[in-house]
Amino acid sequence: MRTLILLTTLLLLALHTQAESPQGSTKEAPDEEQDISVFFGGDKGTALQDAAVKAGVTCSCRTSSCRFGERLSGACRLNGRIYRLCC
């Protein structure tokens, strides 16, 4: 359990650092939503993914903060950049 909390904290810290770093010009609008594939690794990841599908959870990869009713669920990588995974 402690390991999971530590890994989650490190992931969020890396995501926060990535969000604050100066970004070069992008070809996409900052608030544009992208269709992505989200993969969870390992046996527990499969259980998490199955639970999300059963619950009807919709996740989006966002450049800015999560919208009302969404919460930060992790990070996603798109075209080599890391974004917020909001569900």
Curated annotation (Swiss-Prot):
PROSITE patterns recorded: DEFENSIN
Pfam families: Defensin_1, Defensin_propep
Subcellular location: Secreted
Broad class of where this protein is predominantly found: secreted
GO BP term, example: defense response to Gram-negative bacterium
Signal peptide: 1-19
Keywords annotated in UniProt: Antibiotic, Antimicrobial, Defensin, Disulfide bond, Fungicide, Secreted, Signal
GO cellular component: extracellular space
InterPro entries with a match to the protein in the record: Alpha-defensin (IPR016327), Alpha-defensin_C (IPR006081), Alpha-defensin_N (IPR002366), Beta/alpha-defensin_C (IPR006080)
Disulfide-bond pairs as recorded: 59-87, 61-76, 66-86
Propeptide: 20-58
Function: Active in vitro against S.aureus, fungi, Gram-positive and Gram-negative bacteria and to a lesser extent against an enveloped virus.
UniProt similarity note: Belongs to the alpha-defensin family.
Protein name stated in the entry: Neutrophil antibiotic peptide NP-3B
The organism of origin for this protein: Rattus norvegicus
Lineage of origin: Eukaryota, Metazoa, Chordata, Craniata, Vertebrata
